[in-house]
Design a protein with these regions (language model features):
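Bacterial N-terminal signal peptides
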Residues: 3-13
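Intrinsic disorder/low-structure terminal segments
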Residues: 7, 28, 282-283
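A surface/extracellular/periplasmic glyco- and lipid-processing/surface-interacting theme
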Residues: 195-197, 202-330, 335-337
Length: 369
């Protein structure tokens, strides 16, 4: 089962998610690189990445891509959205890949998260995230849609599966990037709004039926990244749609904005419940009979992150990184890897990624030029 540790920081947010079956084929994505990305080494030893092409490999298991222009999401919503990941992929096949029907499917699997929201000494906010899973192929995706906010998000490409009988070479970069737009697990947009998905280990699921346009877990994340500037706007948007949990896994959302507002959005008996909190892991926070249900490890990670906030109410990017490190896989041993850790700067609009618990090397992305 994936594990994601999410910490909401008033300056940055930290999130971690995911777990996949062992033995992932890391060579499948991307298939051959063209010209390398532009990069420069910064004073903090981060590598600044300028994404110039659709998919470029940064290191084994971590790639970056960019999409600009019409992403089809407005048409997706106006057509009624989707109740399942299969319906999402059918929309993409019909809209973008009519000649490649059945080329791929989406296979979202169980995951968990921890997030933290905190303020820095300049009064800005950071958001941090860990994604814990087995080894996988991750894509950092810069999106600049025609009718929405630009954003950076992270996608587990192993959730996007090849259809039966399709060779990997037939899954072009174009197809993978389009599919990835509809499968983000976390991200930040140009307004500084951060979103992360966290799993809750509970037999209950989410299947709202109020006659509204339907969204899956990951398309809800895309909706917020494209259209919400603040937590209040995000909550208003979520209330306008019927949410359906991907693969029937119970999830909750960590959402934080550039003004320091941070909330957990949970669904109890298909009713949306909002709890203001700087820390979120993998158990219910909402008051009531569900409160506390989740893994014992998620309670431990929550306590660690809460303690870090108590000790340091104001944090630097390095402090957030260290907080994420403190709840990474090596401290618990339950999962194969913390696949990625992110520190989002909600004022500078940068995202600093650490891959597979190598906290001495990072990649820095900027949403806007």
């Amino acid at each position: 089962m994936m594990v994601i540790a999410i910490i909401f920081m008033l300056l940055a947010g930290i999130t971690g998610c995911g777990r996949q079956a062992a033995g992932a084929d890391e060579s499948r994505f991307p298939e051959g690189n063209s010209e390398p990305m532009e990069a420069e080494v910064l004073k903090d030893s981060a590598v600044a990445i300028q994404v110039n092409s659709e998919i470029e490999e940064l290191e084994q298991g971590l790639s970056a891509g960019r999409y600009e222009g019409e992403d089809g999401f407005t048409a997706f919503l106006s057509g009624g959205g989707a109740k399942t990941d299969g319906e999402v992929m059918q929309f993409l096949a019909d809209s973008f890949f009519a000649e490649n029907q059945g080329a791929f499917t989406m296979d979202t699997q169980a995951f968990g998260c921890s997030t933290l929201s905190v303020q820095n000494s300049e009064g800005d906010y950071l958001f941090g995230r860990n994604f814990d899973w087995n080894t996988c192929n991750a894509l950092v995706l810069i999106s600049d849609p025609q009718d929405g906010y630009a954003s950076v998000s992270t996608v587990n490409l192993d959730f996007i599966r090849q259809g039966a009988g399709m060779a990997g070479s037939l899954l072009s970069d174009d197809m993978m990037v389009i599919a990835a737009l509809y499968a983000p697990l976390d991200g930040m947009n140009e307004k500084g709004l951060c979103v992360s998905v966290n799993m809750i280990q509970d037999r209950a699921t989410i299947g709202q039926d109020r006659g509204k346009t339907d969204l899956t877990t990951t398309t809800a994340v895309r909706l917020l990244l494209n259209q919400a500037a603040t937590v209040d706007e995000a909550l208003e948007l979520l209330g306008q749609y019927d949410l359906h949990a991907s693969m029937n896994y119970m999830v909750h959302f960590a959402i934080a904005d550039a003004d320091g507002n941070s909330v957990a959005v949970e669904y109890i008996d298909n009713e949306m419940v909002v709890t203001r909190t700087p820390v979120l892991t993998n158990f219910y926070l909402a008051e009531g009979e569900k409160q506390g249900i989740g893994t014992s490890q998620s309670h431990e990670r929550f306590d660690i992150l809460t303690g870090a906030l108590t000790e340091k109410p104001s944090m630097t990017q390095a402090d957030v990184r260290d907080a994420l490190d403190s709840v990474s896989k090596d401290n618990f041993g339950e999962f194969e890897s913390t696949e990625w850790s992110i520190v989002f700067d909600q004022s500078a609009l940068t995202a600093v990624y650490y891959h597979r618990e190598n906290y001495q090397k990072s990649y820095s992305f900027r949403i806007t030029d």
